[in-house]
Regions:
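N-terminal acidic, glycine/proline-rich low-complexity segments
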Residues: 1-225
Length: 225
């Protein structure tokens, strides 16, 4: 790994511009991440939020998961009194990459492809992904030149000593994962989910999304204040 890439992966100083790519409706960790990011104005300037696709018991398809996440992002922005960022929230991919060379066009992918072009290797845009990395891979396929202008920090995969690679965010879109697709051309750091609470079964340890308890136990709703 070159010294240039290593230097870009070191903890930055001061305030950085960042975007968040998140399957917000899936589980509550994404809502905590977005809320924390919005409150960390001394370190992070949130430029955009992208809805990522997901498919499990909380959605009927990857597209449904993405659309539910998009609505959840807007709900959280309202609860956080950050309605000013709603125009910077974008729908993401409605399906996963069909292969490693074909992007899935979406408002999120187009925004990242255009937004990152305004940055430089010396002043990169930080791309934080905490879901399937379809949107980011698609943006890099749409505009490969942005690879040198972004630093990707992705919550996905397992640590190298883990006995398998059956991790939720990676398995959702294997073709888009770092090491397989265009994300490998960017400065990228993976935060293994095995170090962040993923069970050996490959899916995240389930926590109901913010605002309500498990439907099996109660229909009572809780509203953040």
């Amino acid at each position: 790994m070159s010294d240039t890439i290593l230097s870009r992966l070191r903890a930055p100083q001061g305030v950085v511009d960042a975007v968040l790519d998140t399957d917000t409706f899936n589980e509550i960790d994404d809502q905590f991440a977005l809320s924390y990011m919005l409150r960390s104005t001394e370190r992070i300037n949130t430029r955009a939020i992208y809805a990522a696709p997901f498919f499990n018991e909380n959605s009927s398809s990857p597209e449904d998961g993405m659309l539910k996440s998009y609505e959840e992002i807007k709900t959280l922005l309202k609860l956080a009194n950050r309605e000013d960022l709603i125009p910077c929230a974008f729908e993401g991919s409605r399906r996963y990459l069909p292969d490693e060379k074909t992007p899935v066009d979406s408002p999120a992918a187009r925004d990242l492809a255009a937004r990152a072009a305004e940055y430089s290797p010396e002043h990169p845009l930080y791309v934080v992904g905490i879901g399937a990395i379809t949107n980011v891979a698609s943006a890099l396929l749409l505009n490969p030149a942005i690879a040198e202008n972004i630093v990707v920090v992705w919550l996905g995969g397992h640590s190298l000593e883990w006995p398998d690679t059956n991790e939720f965010n990676m398995m959702q879109d294997v073709a888009a994962a770092p090491g397989r697709a265009s994300v490998s051309n960017a400065s990228a750091e993976s935060a293994p989910s095995s170090a962040a609470g993923t069970s050996r079964s490959g899916r995240k340890n389930h926590v109901p999304r913010a605002g309500r308890q498990s439907r099996k136990k109660s229909n009572r709703k809780f509203t953040a204040r």
